From Swiss-Prot:
Stimuli inducing this protein: Regulated by RAM1 during arbuscular mycorrhiza (AM) formation after inoculation with Rhizophagus irregularis. Repressed by inorganic phosphate (Pi), leading to defects in cortical AM colonization of roots in high Pi conditions.
Each ANK repeat, start to end: 135-164, 172-201, 205-234, 238-267, 271-300, 305-334, 338-359, 360-388, 392-421, 425-454, 458-487
Domain of life: Eukaryota
Subcellular location: Cytoplasm, Cytosol; Nucleus; Cell membrane
Record-given protein name: Protein VAPYRIN
The keyword Cell cycle belongs to this UniProt entry's keyword annotation: no
Organism encoding this protein: Petunia hybrida
Disruption phenotype: Impaired arbuscular mycorrhiza (AM) fungi (e.g. Glomus intraradices, G.mosseae and Gigaspora margarita) passage across root epidermis and abolished arbuscule formation in root cortex during AM symbiosis, thus leading to aborted hyphopodia and no arbuscules.
GO terms under biological process: arbuscular mycorrhizal association; detection of phosphate ion; protein K6-linked ubiquitination; response to symbiotic fungus
Amino acid sequence: MDRLLSLEPSNVVTIRLEPGQKCSGVLTLRNVMYTMPVAFRLQPLNKIRYSIRPQSGIISPLTTITLEIIYHLPPNTTLPDSFPHCDDSFLLHSVVAPGATAKDTSSTLDMVPSDWFTTKRKQVFIDSAIKIMFVGSPVLCYLVRKGYMDEIREVLEKSDTTWKSVDSVNFEGQTLLHLAISQGRPDLVQLLLEFGPNIEAHSRSCSSPLEAASATGEALIVELLLAKKASTERTEFSASGPIHLAAGNGHLEVLKLLLLKGANVNSLTKDGNTALHLAVEERRRDCARLLLANGARADICSTGNGDTPLHIAAGLGDEHMVRVLLQKGAEKYIRNKYGKTAYDVAAEHGHNKLFDALRLGDSLCVAARKGEVRTVQRLLENGASINGRDQHGWTALHRACFKGRIEVVKALIDNGIDVNARDEDGYTALHCAVESGHVDVAELLVKKGADIELRTSKGITALQIAQSLHYSGLTRVLMQGGATKEVGTMETNIVKSSGKIAVRDLDIGTIKKRSVNKSRTRRSSFDRNAPLAVL
């Protein structure tokens, strides 16, 4: 027989280390003898660091006794290279004790005479296979910081199931997930997720794991957490939610993942800002465009100071973002809690280049549409951008030509406006003049160098519009100006209904009708009051 006692559950004793708590583990000894009691004595080689209760005793046949091994952690101890395993050794002596009687374990500490275990008197079995393995929060935090994958798995598997070892926290209140995320280790995160951690646990700084990953831009980790149903919304403990942190830090891929999982694009931070506010403030243009494309409100006010994203862009002097926000329908005349519009904020910071987009461009547009030449001249002298465009790409020249304001057209041309500027559908001022039937305006444009052959995005020339609408005078002006007539006979049908005009070419293609919002119609009720934006 090799031994009198078996070690349960194994020869490895796990000792849980926790700050301010007794550090101990248990070992069960089983007497494998059927008829004889067995005496035992367990001794640590390092008696300063360990104590055992009971250290010796009698075990009846086929019964067990549980020992407590207490670890006395010295201050400022340097962890061994073998950590979480320990090189400390123990000696277990056991000997058959005929006629001995087992007593209450609480009274068996050193109750067995030491001479029972001398080989001169009896056959003594000596076992040195007992090993120590440390578990606990400090152990796991240390291993995660070091990135020791195998050791982390082993400690998690060996830990007592009565405490949730995977939810261990360090002295800063960070969970193991937070530590793994801070190191940018998706492999560690995936390992921890196998053991079912609380993925909504907040650190002492009040951030959830998903918020932490969103802030650092760890897209793969974010994907892993979202796969485990991590909440995309800000909790009451957090200052900012995942979408705010991703947008404010410019993490576009993370932002895409959050939006795909249904994150509320207009949710507010604790101080009342949306993700769009933060993206604009940090000049994260790609993130701002993505948010706008996913339904972010361009004119939402902060519950703090009442600023809209446009106020912020104006204060920064960000021309590009001002243009993007205006194109997405931002209302430029909203006032914040201090009674200021975006224009007022731009003026306060000396961003003169934004004046046209935020105010002067509107006035120039209105003056051009109404034919107010003096007002046009004054606005241009005060800094209005002559080539400024509205959200559809129209310049003041487009508007003046559409309305037939020839004196304004002359003034704009004399001041150097681009006569061939195109809107978002490829229409030039000449297209607008022809479609509206203004012969004198079209003739002036041709004389001033307008390109007669330019086509819209649908491939339509000004001459095709004139012929399709049977404008003989305009057709003559364009032909005399050098317009090229299309080869072949062009049959057309004119459809006029609800303020829409569509020209259909039955031989060489179709000139599709344009939408009410963007079409150039001849109805006096057509709204051309949309603001200009500066490019």
